[in-house]
From Swiss-Prot:
One of its GO terms (cellular component) is cytosol. This is Uridylate kinase. Allosterically activated by GTP. Inhibited by UTP. Homohexamer. Belongs to the UMP kinase family. Pathway: Pyrimidine metabolism; CTP biosynthesis via de novo pathway; UDP from UMP (UMPK route): step 1/1. It comes from Vibrio vulnificus (strain YJ016).
């Protein structure tokens, strides 16, 4: 008789990029991709893992891009935050269809649409086995959703921030442009800063470093990768002190 292996993490913060939701469409939300991600999250919940999620908004609007086009950066960032709420609602709906209880908590009050972010409520929901989707970034302009992921991860005392990307982890160079680039298995925060590796923006990364929040970068497009990460198997790149 085999005993079921236990997950390596009890509580995680999963950071998904908005682009991940668009699939091959190039814009918006691909329902097939959304449903697949919901199923992967469901697997974790069934393992007893507590899951917090932060989703970007780049598939709909990106504040920095709008600012480059001449829009006021604060207005652009507000639009970006609302895009993350739209993605969060879509993810909650996909989870509900997969029979997973989920709540969207927004850093910007949107009465009648989703709940306001509340730290104590979030912890309680997670303990009860519900997935909590943190929307609207940090609620402030000039902060990325990577910053929001690290902030919420630290607040809810997650064991790790899992950054889902389109590549297998952190490489010595851009693996798309350079096929010879090598994948790092483990890195320290100092390594990342000294080598100027693009893991996440500096504000987000230094926040994680200062609070000793481990970050694991992995490929969400790889079937079963999320489960393998949570089970403590070799997948992606782990960044720790």
């Amino acid at each position: 008789m085999t005993t079921n292996p236990k997950p390596a993490y009890q509580r995680i913060l999963l950071k998904l990029s908005g682009e991940a939701l668009q699939g091959s469409e190039g814009f918006g939300i691909d329902p097939t991709v959304l449903d697949r991600m919901a199923q992967e999250v469901k697997e974790l919940v069934e393992l007893g893992v507590q899951v917090g999620v932060v989703i970007g908004g780049g598939n709909l609007f990106r504040g920095a891009g709008l600012a480059q086009a001449g829009m006021n950066r604060v207005v652009g960032d507000h639009m970006g935050m609302l895009a993350t709420v739209m993605n969060g609602l879509a993810m909650r709906d996909a989870l509900h269809r997969a029979y997973v209880n989920a709540r969207v908590m927004s850093a910007i009050p949107l009465n009648g649409v989703c709940d306001d972010y509340n730290w104590a409520d979030a912890i309680r929901e997670l303990r009860q086995g519900r997935v909590v989707i943190f929307a609207a970034g940090t609620g402030n302009p000039f902060f990325t959703t990577d910053s929001a992921a690290c902030l919420r991860g630290i607040e809810i005392e997650a064991d790790v921030v899992l950054k889902a990307t389109k590549v297998d982890g952190v490489f010595t160079a851009d693996p798309v442009a350079n096929p010879d680039a090598e994948l790092y298995d483990k890195l320290s925060y100092t390594d990342v800063l000294e080598k100027e590796l693009k893991v996440m923006d500096l504000a987000a990364f230094t926040l994680a470093r200062d609070h000793k929040m481990p970050i694991r970068v992995f490929n969400m497009n790889k079937p079963g990768a999320l489960r393998r990460v949570v089970m403590g198997e070799a997948e992606g790149t782990l960044i720790t002190a």
